[in-house]
Curated annotation (Swiss-Prot):
Protein name: Demethylmenaquinone methyltransferase
UniProt pathway: Quinol/quinone metabolism; menaquinone biosynthesis; menaquinol from 1,4-dihydroxy-2-naphthoate: step 2/2
Listed CDD domains: AdoMet_MTases
Keyword Nucleotide-binding in annotation: no
Family assignment from sequence similarity: Belongs to the class I-like SAM-binding methyltransferase superfamily. MenG/UbiE family.
Length: 230
């Protein structure tokens, strides 16, 4: 039985995975997420405050304030356990925490210049509403950065190897490392089922964002988009 993609099921799953979430990201990215996080931070650029959506345990936000020491970050996630780990891990970091749904942010209209979603786009039940909400809270010409685990193009030589890794090795590692085998299966499937770039980029356009930067990593296994509000 697969997990559904409704909010309560996903929230329960991520709460249960919180203690092992960073290890899971290492498995899904073959350890390359550390490099991608650094690249993402640099591509986001300097801002007084980063609004880190789907923040997880705060690794991307911490990378950001490491790169830009005068900045602060607001971490938003619907998993209280994820935020609890971030609070415990970075007690002295200039972080503010909001437990909530990014499709209904308790944030004023046009109040932020920079937002980011890392490894969370594929888990959003309603990407259209989430993008519209982010557009609402960004100032004119504000930016949204997205870092996501994606797939090589269908005709790429690494496409088959990537599919086999997600289909067989990730669930196997999940069985060995965790009691929550179903969650590992879901996370692998979420990468496979993420729509292609053309579809996602039309969503961005429909939500009144334009692409200012885009970069692929590891033959397309990860993608960064920097979007500007229009």
């Amino acid at each position: 039985m697969q997990l559904s993609t409704n909010k309560p099921d996903l929230q329960e799953m991520f709460d249960s995975l919180a203690p092992k979430y960073d290890r899971i990201n290492s498995i899904l990215s073959l350890g390359m997420h550390h490099l991608w996080n650094r690249k993402f931070s640099k591509m986001l650029g300097k801002s007084e405050c980063l609004l880190d959506l789907c923040s997880g345990t705060g690794k991307v936000a911490y990378r950001y304030i490491h790169d830009y020491p005068k900045s602060q970050a607001i971490l938003v996630d619907f998993s209280s356990n994820m935020l609890a780990i971030a609070k415990q891990r970075y007690p002295k970091a200039p972080f503010t925490f909001i437990e909530g749904d990014i499709a209904q942010l308790p944030i004023d209209q046009e109040s932020h210049t920079l937002a980011a979603i890392s490894y969370g786009l594929r888990n959003l039940p309603d990407r259209k509403n989430a993008l519209n909400e982010i557009h609402r809270i960004l100032k004119p010409n504000g930016c949204l950065g997205i870092l996501e685990l994606t797939s090589p193009s269908d005709n790429h030589p690494m496409y088959l190897a990537h599919r086999l890794y997600l289909k067989f090795l990730v669930p196997l590692i999940g069985r060995l490392c965790s009691k929550n085998k179903q969650a590992y299966h879901y996370l692998a499937e979420s990468i496979k089922n993420l729509p292609k770039d053309d579809y996602l980029e039309q969503l961005f356009k429909d939500a009144q964002f334009q692409i200012s930067k885009k970069r692929k990593f590891a033959f397309g296994a990860a993608t960064i988009w920097i979007l500007q509000k229009i």
